Swiss-Prot record:
Induction: Expressed in the late phase of the viral replicative cycle. Pfam families: Pox_T4_N. Keywords: Late protein, Signal. This is Protein OPG195. Coiled coil: none annotated. Residues 1-17 form the signal peptide. It comes from the Viruses. Belongs to the chordopoxvirinae B9 protein family.
Amino acid sequence: MRSLIIVLLFPSIIYSMSIRRCEKTEEETWGLKIGLCIIAKDFYPERTDCSVHLPTASEGLITEGNGFRDIRNTDKL
C-alpha cells in the first residue's frame, strides 16, 4: 500500500519534464531532464566549513541539515 501511495504522489512533484534525442542521427538514444520541487518540513541547518565559488555570481555558502544541502548566493542575502 505504501509503494502505491509513493507511485501516485511521484507525478505530482514533477513540475517540468522534457525528453529529446541526444544526437539527431541517433534514434535509440534519448536524453531525459526532470525538474523536481522538494519541500522539506523541519529543516535544521548546520553551518559547514565548505565555501563554493560560483562562476556566474560571487560566493556561495553550503548549509546542510536533515540530508539536504542548501547553496545560497551571498550577493542576494
